[in-house]
Regions:
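Non-catalytic terminal regions of proteins
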Residues: 1-14, 167-232
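Contiguous, non-catalytic segments that form substrate-binding/exosite surfaces or channel walls
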Residues: 1-47, 55
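Active-site-adjacent bridging/hinge elements
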Residues: 34-43, 66-77
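Second-shell residues forming the walls of enzyme active-site clefts
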Residues: 46-50, 93
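Long, well-structured alpha-helical subdomains associated
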Residues: 56, 99-202
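Active-site recognition of the HExxH zinc-binding catalytic motif
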Residues: 58-75, 94, 99
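Post-HEXXH active-site segment of zinc metalloproteases
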Residues: 74-92
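An active-site-proximal "capping" alpha-helix that borders the catalytic cofactor pocket
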Residues: 87-104
Length: 232
């Protein structure tokens, strides 16, 4: 779990630079991660050629980009005008900023190799876009994931073969994320709740493949833990 906290910009460096925003990241060190369950999930839902790219440790890079994304883009003045839809749109915007910026850092700054980029992309898709259940309106992060899954699928960035295994066109991810980020920011800039609602209704659809993915995950279940009984 990674979270970011904005700090006051009253230190010497921030003042000298004209007032920059600083983020502090908090990462949960002890994490519950079921390696065996993920292997089963990959065998059921992901093309074997992609297994080597799914790496749980790569999610931290996406998370940092996501938290940075909250510090950029339209301000609260615009976001608040979207009413009850603002949280879904904002979480989704942060996701797309992360993926789009990672692509730019790889292309222009050579911060990531092609293999590293594939690991980040594949891990993001499998770890966050493979939902366990249909999200509800009060779950903005999961609603955002559903939006992104459908957008990638409709734009042929991801697809499933006759064996119901995921395939990814890595070359299309960066541009798709950039286009979706542009569209999302336009929704925020519109200051119109109806635009946000229409955007969510358009993309947050619980379709055939989302249902299949959720069914498989429910079938696989979760890792059983040792039951500890304490007698006083």
């Amino acid at each position: 779990i990674t979270q970011a906290q904005n700090l006051p910009n009253n230190d010497k460096i921030a003042i000298k630079c004209g007032g920059w925003r600083r983020n502090v990241y908090h990462r949960q060190v002890l994490q519950s991660y079921d390696v065996e369950n993920e292997k089963k999930l990959l065998n059921r839902l992901v093309d074997p050629e992609l297994h080597k790219y799914v790496d749980h440790s790569q999610i931290i890079i996406f998370d940092i980009g996501h938290e940075n994304g909250h510090s950029l883009g339209p301000t609260a003045e615009y976001q608040n005008e979207l009413g009850v839809f603002k949280h879904i749109i904002e979480e989704h915007k942060a996701n797309m900023f992360s993926i789009a910026s990672i692509a730019e850092l790889a292309k222009k700054e050579e911060k990531f190799t092609k293999e590293e980029l594939k690991k980040i992309y594949a891990s993001w898709i499998v770890e966050t876009l493979f939902l366990r259940a249909r999200p509800v309106f009060s779950q903005p992060h999961r609603m955002a994931s559903l939006i992104e899954f459908n957008y990638l699928f409709e734009n042929k960035v991801i697809w499933f073969d006759s064996n119901k295994k995921l395939h990814i066109d890595f070359d299309l991810i960066g541009m798709a994320a950039y286009r979706l980020l542009e569209e999302t920011i336009r929704v925020q800039l519109s200051k119109t709740a109806s635009n946000a609602k229409a955007f969510i209704n358009r993309w947050a659809v619980w379709g055939e493949w989302s249902r299949h993915i959720a069914d498989v995950q429910r079938e696989l279940g979760v890792k059983p833990y040792i039951k500890i009984i304490t007698n006083f």
